[in-house]
Amino acid sequence: MLLLLCNRSVVPRGIRRILRTAATVTSLRWNHTGPSASETLLEKNIRNIGILAHIDGGKTTTTERMLFYAGKTNVLGEVHHGNTVTDFLVQERERGITICSAAVSFDWRDHRVNLLDTPGHIDFTMEVEQSLAAVDGTVVILDGSAGVEAQTVTVWSQADRHRLPRLVFVNKMDKESADFEGCLEELEKKLGVVAVPLQMPVIKEGKLTGVVDVLSGAQVVWDKQNHGRTYKAIPLVDQQLVEAQDKLYQIIDVLSGMDDGLAQVIIESDSMDNVKPELVASAIRACTMKQQIVPVFLGSAYKNIGVQLLMDAVLKYLPAPNERNEIYNCFGSDFVGKISKVTHDKQRGPLSLVRVFRGTLKKGAKIITAKGTSETIQRIYAPWADEYREISSISAGNVGLCAGPKSTVTGDLVVANASVLRNALKKLSPTNDGVEEDDINELLASKLSFHTVVPDAVYFCSIEPPSSSYQAALDAALREIQREDPSLRVSYDETTMQTVLGGMGKLHLEIIKSRILSEYKIDVDLGPLQIAYKETLEEPARGSWTAEKEIAGSKQLVRMEVTVHAKRKDERFLLDSSPEAQENLRMIRPRQMSYVRKGSLAALERGPKLGGQLMDVAVTLHQLTIGKGTADTFIMAATAQCVRHVLSSAKCRLMEPIMLLEMVMPAEHLNPILADLGKRRCEILDVTARGQQHKVLRANAPLAELEDYSSEVRCISSGTASVSMEPNGYALLSEMDEASAIRRAHGLE
């Protein structure tokens, strides 16, 4: 093996030792053997990761290279050839984009890596949210020529919500316009992170030929003849060596401000020269785990450069399952897991992707959800995109697909039995010994945060089968697809007697239609797309309501008084705190009050103008009388009727969805695009330079003004500009625009 020797005249002794110790890699072919699928791996040897990026960032290509180098595939899958492992849907291969997240597993250096490849398009952001519930860390991929893009910010925020450590891989560094330093600046400015580059690009004659591994002080180059399977480390000399030394000093300087052990060594020796290489690596890992830094790597997955070093970094710097999720320790060695996704297979039926946090899930096991539903695990499969290999169990820290559960949905907590749930809850909240069954799910959700964040629909449209004989089959298909994709909203409009779909965008709904045809053989028609407006109150309104009815010989009575008003805090249901109100309300049982709350929140889902969800609106309950023997469901229905009655007399306004546009264009097309945006009620946020010839424009734009906007931009810029968009809140419509929106919704415009 080649031992890297350093130029003594330019490199201090301590740094020489770090470089000399680490850079002992030469040309070699990795042995792809690892733990067999039947072995029970130690949790410390497992990594559960998600691959995140803006659309066309190179997620799927990077994933395919990982599978190839790990020996799981014999041929390099290419998105443009439609032969990738993880893009298996017909629609994915036709369009060249990822629509559904796909799970694959491979072995690398005696570790098991469970990887989820996720979509990059904003319309399928729910797939990203589902995937993040099953992983312990992420790799965020940037296009080296585009930097931090709109959807990069979105997926980064999602990873922040899940408190996931992450690495960044700056991909497509083979492009002439790639700018590694620019990407580092954008990571820090747009995402507010401390980006620590552990590599530098090697550019010769304008082409990426390899990378400099700063920690080892080696230039690494890949063999083009065998698709980059083998690579070698070359000693650094002259200017490259000096630059690597400077970068290493910068890394140690950053880490010493965060890692006490590293800082102590430097203080005691009054120098960075005595820092041992293993201490540097340990500090990088510790700071990454605490999300204090983001290690940055580079390469070109398509050109087979840098991927193996990224795979090594996943093992070195991202956490093992037993280094996270400490809250699940309350379950001890009993089985507990989470459903992160549900899919449907024609032969196997519904399959639930389960992440096991503690214990072991075995074939034939009886489990329950936190909602109290009992399920049986009939079969267990190791995930491999759309192919499955049956296994006998899933150990702690791993993921697997389970056949058998009929009612599980994304976000469900699943455990061995009811007593396990009870014991865990007691450990988490010792004061909750007397909790009722109806409340256990909410208590566990508040402690374990297992509710999935489902984004609001942006568009909706009607859906019709080719004939009434297909209606039952269509309803069943929509139930299955909605179980897979919680961001798809399905409702029934009693006025038009039509089924209505709500989705994240035009593409989302087009894919739903295509899937119904290809998977269920139903050629449905979609109605015109409508904007999913929301509603809000201009001023509070107060009213009372009495609901009285006899059901099966039992008299049902609910009498209440409520106010609907602007939400002051996060809570959407409040109790009047006046002494008079409190004297009345404290007579109501907690279980009954929970149904009053549910009824109030249900009523806030449909406003009086266009049936849009009410934003920033709360309900305050003043007085409540419940007749003896009144059913809980009647209480909930009566409350919803009361709130709707009060809303009908309140002054409401429409709010329209706003999109954040990010456009990249040659500088000469900036003014025509600005002029066009001015006609669309847009708010220009900023215009920045990217390189010498391009501009990046960010603007807030009403969704109603953006129909086929991508096509318009291509026409204005002669096909040279790109545009991406993501939801960015809601804004109040003017009275004139509101009237126009109502006319359009009723088909009058």
UniProtKB/Swiss-Prot annotation:
Pfam families: EF-G_D2 (PF22042), EFG_C (PF00679), EFG_III (PF14492), GTP_EFTU (PF00009). InterPro entries: EF-G-like_DII (IPR053905), EFG2 (IPR030851), EFG_II (IPR041095), EFG_III (IPR009022), EFG_III/V (IPR035647), EFG_V (IPR035649), EFG_V-like (IPR000640), G_TR_CS (IPR031157). Residues 1-22 form a transit peptide. It is found in: Mitochondrion. One of its GO terms (cellular component) is mitochondrion. Its main location: mitochondrion. GO terms for biological process: mitochondrial translation; ribosome disassembly. GTP binds at residues 53-60, 117-121, 171-174. Keywords: GTP-binding, Mitochondrion, Nucleotide-binding, Protein biosynthesis, Transit peptide. It comes from the Eukaryota. Residues 44-322 form the tr-type G domain. GO terms for molecular function: GTP binding; GTPase activity. HAMAP family: mEF_G_2 (MF_03059). Mitochondrial GTPase that mediates the disassembly of ribosomes from messenger RNA at the termination of mitochondrial protein biosynthesis. Not involved in the GTP-dependent ribosomal translocation step during translation elongation. Belongs to the TRAFAC class translation factor GTPase superfamily. Classic translation factor GTPase family. EF-G/EF-2 subfamily. This is Ribosome-releasing factor 2, mitochondrial. It comes from Culex quinquefasciatus.
